[in-house]
């Protein structure tokens, strides 16, 4: 019968050999893919500037006074853009926002005419 020292050594070497064999497994193997799969993070439904957090939150139930006259602008370019402003905000930022939109739409119109 082999000595206990020899049996322990063989057992240790076989365990190390198994770890080495598992470490060298292909990244494409199904077992490795199962181990590496993680649940993707889902982004929140709405993105809000930090200064406006809670002002227009539908969960709160009540909005700031003066929010009855809201301005909402949505348009589709290569991507969707939506902007929602309260009455006070539209008075404060409306002119700048209008100029910004006009510049964007004017550049797009010029590119369309140049392509034709």
UniProtKB/Swiss-Prot annotation:
Q: Which residues form the signal peptide?
A: 1-23
UniProt PTM = O-octanoylated by GOAT/MBOAT4. O-octanoylation is essential for ghrelin activity.
Q: Where is the composition biased (Basic and acidic residues)?
A: 31-42
Task: List residues modified as Leucine amide.
Answer: 97
* GO MF term set: ghrelin receptor binding; growth hormone-releasing hormone activity; hormone activity; protein tyrosine kinase activator activity
GO CC aspect terms:
axon; extracellular region; extracellular space
Localization, per the record, is: Secreted
Q: Where is the lipid attached (O-decanoyl serine)?
A: 26
| InterPro entries linked | Motilin_assoc, Motilin_ghrelin, Preproghrelin
Q: Which UniProt keywords apply?
A: Amidation, Hormone, Lipoprotein, Secreted, Signal
Q: Where is this region: Disordered?
A: 29-67
O-octanoyl serine lipid modification positions:
26
Family, per entry: Belongs to the motilin family.
Protein name, please? Answer: Appetite-regulating hormone
